[in-house]
Amino acid sequence: MAQRLLLRRFLASVISRKPSQGQWPPLTSRALQTPQCSPGGLTVTPNPARTIYTTRISLTTFNIQDGPDFQDRVVNSETPVVVDFHAQWCGPCKILGPRLEKMVAKQHGKVVMAKVDIDDHTDLAIEYEVSAVPTVLAMKNGDVVDKFVGIKDEDQLEAFLKKLIG
């Protein structure tokens, strides 16, 4: 319920206003912007404490939603992509995921990371021959250029990323 309300507020603010330099408009609903009268005759006025400001950030990691999303954001990407095939129940995935995200973020946009849950996207796991998790693919111009299975330390991950970037 709270997520739906927050999404509704966000969409209302994005549609009604253009973002200012470096910031999104405040997340408020139209109900909070204009006074409302209730059946009891009470007037509700906007509460400034409910205004939320956000800043624009560059996302280097994203979750794949479906096959066409994978095609669009990974295969057709001009930026090299690290694809992390993982599962919620996988212990090593929970260690590698944050470590890999941190290393990708250090590359400042030279590479991005796509996360694919194999339980939700078994078709992609089969297509890319994922037989164990975590499996990480390095993709450039739609082609798999490197791959590893299992956990790697930060030095090995850095070498993997440098090889992908070129």
Swiss-Prot record:
Q: Which Pfam families match?
A: Thioredoxin (PF00085)
One GO term describing the cellular component? mitochondrial matrix
Q: Name one GO molecular function term.
A: protein-disulfide reductase activity
Mainly localized where? Answer: mitochondrion
Q: In which tissues is it expressed?
A: Widely expressed in adult (at protein level) and fetal tissues.
Q: Where is the Thioredoxin domain?
A: 61-166
* Biological processes, Gene Ontology terms: cell redox homeostasis
Site residues by UniProt (Deprotonates C-terminal active site Cys): D84
Question: What residues span the transit peptide?
Answer: 1-59
Q: Where in the cell is it found?
A: Mitochondrion
Q: Which Gene3D superfamilies match?
A: Glutaredoxin (3.40.30.10)
Name the job this protein performs: Important for the control of mitochondrial reactive oxygen species homeostasis, apoptosis regulation and cell viability Is involved in various redox reactions including the reduction of protein disulfide bonds, through the reversible oxidation of its active center dithiol to a disulfide.
Quaternary organization? Monomer.
The protein's name is: Thioredoxin, mitochondrial
Organism classification, top ranks?
Eukaryota, Metazoa, Chordata, Craniata, Vertebrata
Q: Which gene encodes it?
A: TXN2
